[in-house]
């Protein structure tokens, strides 16, 4: 993929959510909540210079943030850095 975010933005791929409950009930796609965690796939030059994030970082983000995009058949989220709540190590 050759996508480069602009400004203070990052491209994030959401982490997959379980499709089954612990008791084995299958959850349909329309009943699942989208996960609020993901992996940074690309970041702007501005964000890279700050050194706080890098490609591969796992992040937590605000519920109603970002713009959904589809690139090369995969779904991603373009987020402003200010919408990121933290990283997972």
Curated annotation (Swiss-Prot):
UniProt keyword annotation of Chaperone present: yes
Record localization: Cytoplasm
Pfam families in the record: Cpn10
Lineage top rank: taxon: Bacteria
Any one annotated GO CC term: cytoplasm
Main location: cytoplasm
InterPro entries for the chain: Chaperonin_GroES, Chaperonin_GroES_sf, GroES-like_sf
TM segment ranges: none
Alphabetical UniProt keywords: Chaperone, Cytoplasm
Position of the signal peptide: none
One of the GO BP terms on file: chaperone cofactor-dependent protein refolding
GO molecular-function term, one example from the UniProt record: ATP binding
NCBIfam families, A to Z: PRK00364.3-3
Function: Together with the chaperonin GroEL, plays an essential role in assisting protein folding. The GroEL-GroES system forms a nano-cage that allows encapsulation of the non-native substrate proteins and provides a physical environment optimized to promote and accelerate protein folding. GroES binds to the apical surface of the GroEL ring, thereby capping the opening of the GroEL channel.
Subunit structure comment from the entry: Heptamer of 7 subunits arranged in a ring. Interacts with the chaperonin GroEL.
Family: Belongs to the GroES chaperonin family.
UniProt protein name: Co-chaperonin GroES
UniProt organism field: Wolinella succinogenes (strain ATCC 29543 / DSM 1740 / CCUG 13145 / JCM 31913 / LMG 7466 / NCTC 11488 / FDC 602W)
Gene name for this UniProt entry: groES
């Amino acid at each position: 993929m050759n996508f480069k975010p602009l400004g203070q933005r990052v491209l994030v791929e959401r982490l997959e959510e379980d499709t089954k409950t612990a008791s084995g009930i299958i959850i349909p796609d329309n009943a699942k909540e989208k996960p609020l965690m993901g992996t940074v796939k690309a970041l702007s030059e501005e964000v890279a210079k700050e050194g706080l994030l890098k490609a591969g970082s796992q992040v937590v983000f605000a519920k109603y943030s970002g713009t959904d995009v589809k690139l090369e058949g995969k779904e991603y989220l373009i987020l402003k850095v200010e919408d990121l709540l933290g990283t997972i190590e």
